[in-house]
């Protein structure tokens, strides 16, 4: 930085570290990497930067906040011996998109049907059965990204805060129950042997199912919103509508982190659109 203008980046290539300068810097490191790099550069919540021993270039409290994602849980089932489990075959070819009961947000839920399921954290080619994946497409809750170290090679701390909000738990809970109802259909009678998870004990009440949700909820890898754009009136808006970092010159963020909220779909196409739009402005 020279004053409040970004003038370049420090780059590591192999064992070599060098600087690259430009009239305008485009930061495009994703929903985790972009806020991390900004904070390591002194742009972020001042208290957190001081806590990490980083000189404050710009107090921007929204950097790393507003972490949005699509929380999901998996409902795996055992299959009968004659059902083919092929790890090489296409797995997810069918999805149900729907609006949760009582929701004012259209298409806020999704259920994916998969013809092959492997254990969480295990060998992806080891078949345990088939599964439904229940996805909350528009969560109310939001998390944060914070630095764990001043070393850029150390992954920052991710606090997703999944299902902190009762409405998020309610919708995902009912989504799981819809998965179980689908499994009662006649077409599954010759396929399904029984549930792997949740267990009958997990299904006793809303509270027991909520505990199962909290143990099993995971990311759909659509982390968004951690450098969100917004109007002047929003103190948590990191960027303006043209993706410029507010309070600085010569620096934009262009990736999924600019979204104010996670879209109700996979994020890849939208991220490409954002990049194409900014490229038009720069040309």
Report each predicted region and the residues it spans.
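Glycine-rich loop(s) and the adjacent beta-strand/alpha-helix scaffold that form part
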Residues: 2-87, 149-150
């Amino acid at each position: 930085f020279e004053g409040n203008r970004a003038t370049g980046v420090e780059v590591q290539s192999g064992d070599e570290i060098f600087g690259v300068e430009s009239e305008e810097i485009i930061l495009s490191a994703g929903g985790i990497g972009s806020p991390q790099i900004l904070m390591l550069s002194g742009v972020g919540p001042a208290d957190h930067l001081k806590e990490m021993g980083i000189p404050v270039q710009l107090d921007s409290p929204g950097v790393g906040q507003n972490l949005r994602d699509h929380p999901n849980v998996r409902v795996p089932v055992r299959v009968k011996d004659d059902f083919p489990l092929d790890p090489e075959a296409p797995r997810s070819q069918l999805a149900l998109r729907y609006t949760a009961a009582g929701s004012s947000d259209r298409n806020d839920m999704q259920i994916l049907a998969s013809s092959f399921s492997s254990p969480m954290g295990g060998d992806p080619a080891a078949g345990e059965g088939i599964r439904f994946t229940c996805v909350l497409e528009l969560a109310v809750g939001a998390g944060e990204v914070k630095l764990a170290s001043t070393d850029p090679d150390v992954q920052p701390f991710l606090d997703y805060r999944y299902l902190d909000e009762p409405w998020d738990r309610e919708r995902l809970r009912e989504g799981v129950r819809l998965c179980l109802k689908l499994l009662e259909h006649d077409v599954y009678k010759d396929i399904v042997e029984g549930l792997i998870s949740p267990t009958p004990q997990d299904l006793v009440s809303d509270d027991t199912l909520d505990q199962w949700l909290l143990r099993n909820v995971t990311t759909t890898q659509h982390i968004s919103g951690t450098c969100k754009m917004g109007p002047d009136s929003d103190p948590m808006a990191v960027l303006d509508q043209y993706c410029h970092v507010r309070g600085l010159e010569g620096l934009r963020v262009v990736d999924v982190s600019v979204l104010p909220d996670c879209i109700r779909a996979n994020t890849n196409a939208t991220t490409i659109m954002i990049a194409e739009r900014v490229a038009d402005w720069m040309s």
